[in-house]
A protein has these predicted regions:
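Short, well-structured N-terminal submotif of metal-dependent ribonuclease cores
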Residues: 1-40, 55-63
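Acidic, PIN/NYN-like endoribonuclease modules and their adjacent C-terminal/linker elements
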Residues: 2, 105-137
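Short, conserved active-site loops that position catalytic residues or coordinate cofactors/metal ions
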Residues: 9, 42-50
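Active-site neighborhoods of divalent-metal-dependent phosphate/nucleic-acid chemistry enzymes
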Residues: 27, 74-116
């Protein structure tokens, strides 16, 4: 279960966000998803579902969100596990990050990804084996 790149929640959210203020980010996200060999984590999928059905300006219906999630089944997905939780905590301590960001980094390592596309972490920073790239910067 390997992929060169891991996608963070915000990239997926922008790909389906229909609000005008995020239209340029939507295009970037859609183009990125169409052009790279990426993987995901269960955490990213969970965060995506909650965000697009409850938190964005024009929420998706639960059925629309489910349909999008079902299309992601073909990509490598790192499940949540006890080991991943522990490594997420270790990462949060080591890098002084919120736990959730530490867990995303742990999943990226497990996936074998060298690049994590995210706008939530420092663009260009190397966290162990994983470099963060902000596609919206």
């Amino acid at each position: 279960m390997n992929a060169d790149f891991m996608i963070d929640t915000n990239v997926l959210v922008y790909a389906v966000d229909h609000s005008a203020e995020n239209s340029s980010k939507k295009k970037i996200a859609v183009d990125l998803l169409a052009s790279v060999d990426f993987g995901l984590s269960a955490q990213v999928l969970q965060e995506f579902y909650v965000t697009v059905t409850r938190k964005i300006r024009k929420p998706l219906s639960q059925t629309q969100a489910l349909a999008f999630l079902e299309r992601l089944e073909v990509f490598p997905i790192i499940p949540s596990s006890y080991g991943l939780v522990l490594q997420g905590v270790r990462n949060s301590l080591k890098y002084q990050l919120p736990y959730w960001d530490g867990a995303i980094l742990a999943a990226a390592v497990e996936l074998g990804a060298k690049t994590l596309f995210s706008e939530d972490l420092n663009d260009g920073q190397l966290y162990g084996e994983v470099r963060v790239s902000n596609p919206f910067a």
